[in-house]
Structures are given as C-alpha cells and as structure tokens.
C-alpha cells in the first residue's frame, strides 16, 4: 500500500446505504443523503454511554467522608463546569449546568479517541470483523459536529421563544439593529445570518481542529518508517492533549454563551 493509499484508507468512514441497508465500498462510492457513517454513530453512542456509566457509578458510590481519587476527579470536573455556567449564564434554567457538563465530557471523550494508535481499531475491524473501513474519532466527522451544533441551535430557538415569546423573538429578528419597519428586510438578513452562523461556526470549528489533528497522525504513520514515527508522534500527542481539552472547553463555553444570549434581551 502506497502512502497515498494508506492516508486515503484511514480517511474513509464505515458507511451504510440506508436504501439497501448494506455496507458500501469506500473506494467506489460517493456519499449521498442516504449514506450513514455508522462508525461515527457507534463510537458517539458508546462514548455517551461510557460518560453516563462513569458519572452514575460515582454518584451511587459518593460518600460524605474522604472521597476516592476518581470521585475527587469527577467532583473537580463538576465544580469547574458549574463555575463556568455560574459566570456565563445569567438565566434561571436548571438544565444548563447538566447540559454543559454533558457537552464538555462527551466532546472530550470523542476527542480523546484521537490519541489511540492510528492503526489499532481499524486493524481489528478489518482482520477480525471484516470491515472495509473504520474511523474512530467521531468529532473528526463533520456530520457529528454539525448534528451536535444543530441540537444547540434548536435550544437557542427554544429558549429565545420561552423567554421572549414568539412576538419578542420575531421582533428581535425584524426590528434590530434598525428600529424602523422600513428596515425589516435588512434586519432580517443581518439577524438571520448572525443566528445561523452560530451553529455552523460551532460545528465546523470542532470538526476542523479534530480533522487536522487526526490527519497529522495519519501523515506521520503513512510517510515515516515505523521505527522513527515516535520522534514526531510523542510530541504531537502531548500537544494534542491540550488541543482536545481546549476544543471540548470551547464547545461548552460557546454553548453556554449562546443560550445565555438567547435568554436575555438583545
């Protein structure tokens, strides 16, 4: 396999054609609306369940005495997220903090998959399960990141209408920044673009950073001899720990900020 083939192989998703419910050939297929990236969906669900299992286990075993190391770690994460929500969200909703915690930990776990050896799970998938392709970093799939951003967008609309009413939401889109009926078309364009840019930028920012990080690991593995890969892999992996944490934090912060803006007057 040439370096070009190796890189291309690792950038292919395991895809299911929803019209025939059969796996597609990643080398002779163009993705369509009816194509589902089942590897991204699988790892997203598994990591979500892992998050729920970890926090449920800690909640059941939590004691008022001296906590264990894992409980202390989880409490630090909860305290950090709670402090962030308290500083940035000025509404009264009780679901924002749990939502922010879910977003932060879930996105972090997705990003963390990028630190696994690049050939480990694809090799297992190919030689044990006969899978034609496998990508293990859900946040490097634009479909996953934009889907999560779409969920945030729906919440933005929900909280805007809940806090301001339908009339207030429509007025915000049509009467600002120019408070005159003659400027309604201009206001609608400006506010509409501003509103739609939030989920698009939120999803593409996470995707772009994680895709680039994954691609660098693939390039190192595909272009260098195996005995010299560690020279670049180790420093990049150490630096990437910061990237995956920072991207999870940014996604959480922007989610909180957008929902806070939706809950307030313009």
Curated annotation (Swiss-Prot):
The keyword Transport applies. Belongs to the ATPase A chain family. F-type ATPases have 2 components, CF(1) - the catalytic core - and CF(0) - the membrane proton channel. CF(1) has five subunits: alpha(3), beta(3), gamma(1), delta(1), epsilon(1). CF(0) has three main subunits: a(1), b(2) and c(9-12). The alpha and beta chains form an alternating ring which encloses part of the gamma chain. CF(1) is attached to CF(0) by a central stalk formed by the gamma and epsilon chains, while a peripheral stalk is formed by the delta and b chains. The lineage of its organism: Bacteria, Pseudomonadati, Pseudomonadota, Gammaproteobacteria, Enterobacterales. It is found in: Cell inner membrane. PROSITE patterns: ATPASE_A (PS00449). The chain crosses the membrane at residues 33-53, 95-115, 141-161, 206-226, 237-257. The keyword S-adenosyl-L-methionine does not apply. GO terms for cellular component: plasma membrane; proton-transporting ATP synthase complex. It comes from Klebsiella pneumoniae subsp. pneumoniae (strain ATCC 700721 / MGH 78578). It is a multi-pass membrane protein. It comes from the Bacteria. Keywords: ATP synthesis, Cell inner membrane, Cell membrane, CF(0), Hydrogen ion transport, Ion transport, Membrane, Transmembrane, Transmembrane helix, Transport. GO terms for molecular function: proton-transporting ATP synthase activity, rotational mechanism. Key component of the proton channel; it plays a direct role in the translocation of protons across the membrane. This is ATP synthase subunit a. GO terms for biological process: proton motive force-driven plasma membrane ATP synthesis.
